[in-house]
Amino acid sequence: MAQGRDGGNPFAEPGELDNPFQDPAVIQHRPSTHYATLDVYNPFETREPPPSYEPPAPVPIAPPSAPPLQSSRKLSPTEPKNYGSYSTQASTAAATAELLKKQEELNRKAEELDRRERELQHAALGSTATRQNNWPPLPSFCPVQPCFFQDISMEIPQEFQKTVSTMYYLWMCSTLALLLNFLACLASFCVETSNGSGFGLSILWILLFTPCSFVCWYRPMYKAFRSDSSSNFFVFFFIFFVQDVLFVLQAIGIPGWGFSGWISALVVLKVNTAVAVLMLLVALFFTGIAVLGIVMLKRIHSLYRRTGASFQKAQQEFAAGVFSNPAVRTAAANAAAGAAENAFRAP
């Protein structure tokens, strides 16, 4: 029987033959550990280590856009905003500076045009009809009226206005120096009675030089620059050269001449120190005026050379001025008529 169960295998072991579950037919239909079905699957049956846990790859998340930084300092309403680069700002600043420069030039040209327009209007209406004398500036109740009309900004070309103004200030300084010289000579006469002649001459100089210097050298210079007159330039050069010599003599201060110069001040220093100091200040003032007078004479001469004036032009202007004078023409006509009548009466 055993032989019949094992299929006639005499070499089979007795245990295996007695185990009914070792039947090949049964083993064939037993579930395998490698191919387990769902109903017989036991998760605790395997002894292999569980696979390591692999987390899913993280999906990259775009960082949130940061809000634009705002300056903690608020711009004032008048403060310009920075809309461009440095080069743009530099070019804008250069353009602005150029525009300002052109605007200033246009303003100067407009002022010059206004001045010329006023000159043309005065010339068209007539100088005597519209221009009233305004110098010297006397009060209205004074019985003496102004003798000259003077307006440097209107009558003198712009390039010569500074020179004419400087000469006007020089004349004013010379007048002030003569007044201080009179006071110094008065003080000197008070401390030293022998200086009476100098005190008397100081009064004469202030009364003589003040009006004569204005009429003899300042007015010719003013008219020369106003109308580009060569004859007035020559009159000015001759008289102002003499005036410069007088300025030097005033600064030297020869005793008895009525000038409180350096020599007179040093002489009085032995008598009274306070009066000598006053005379030294006047001498210093005279010295400054003399230096400025020499400098201005050279400067005006250089301007005269650049204007194209000449001695021949001065002669022509002088001749034209003489023959255009009605009094001169009347005198010349009378002289010619008298000479002709005498010639016909001669035997």
From Swiss-Prot:
GO annotation, cellular component aspect: recycling endosome membrane; trans-Golgi network membrane
Residues modified to Phosphoserine: 32, 72, 76, 85
Topological relation to the membrane, as annotated: Multi-pass membrane protein
The keyword Coiled coil is annotated on this UniProt entry: no
Cross-link (Glycyl lysine isopeptide (Lys-Gly) (interchain with G-Cter in SUMO1)), chain numbering: 313
Modification Phosphotyrosine, positions: 41, 53, 83
Assigned keywords, A-Z: Isopeptide bond, Membrane, Phosphoprotein, Protein transport, Transmembrane, Transmembrane helix, Transport, Ubl conjugation
Location of this chain's protein in the cell: Membrane
Phosphothreonine: residues bearing it: 37
Comp. bias intervals (Pro residues): 49-67
Principal localisation: membrane
Segments on the Cytoplasmic face: 1-170, 298-347
GO biological process: protein transport
Subunit structure of this chain's protein: Interacts with NEDD4 and NEDD4L and TSG101. Interacts with RNF126.
Protein purpose: Functions in post-Golgi recycling pathways. Acts as a recycling carrier to the cell surface.
Protein name in the entry: Secretory carrier-associated membrane protein 3
Biological source species: Bos taurus
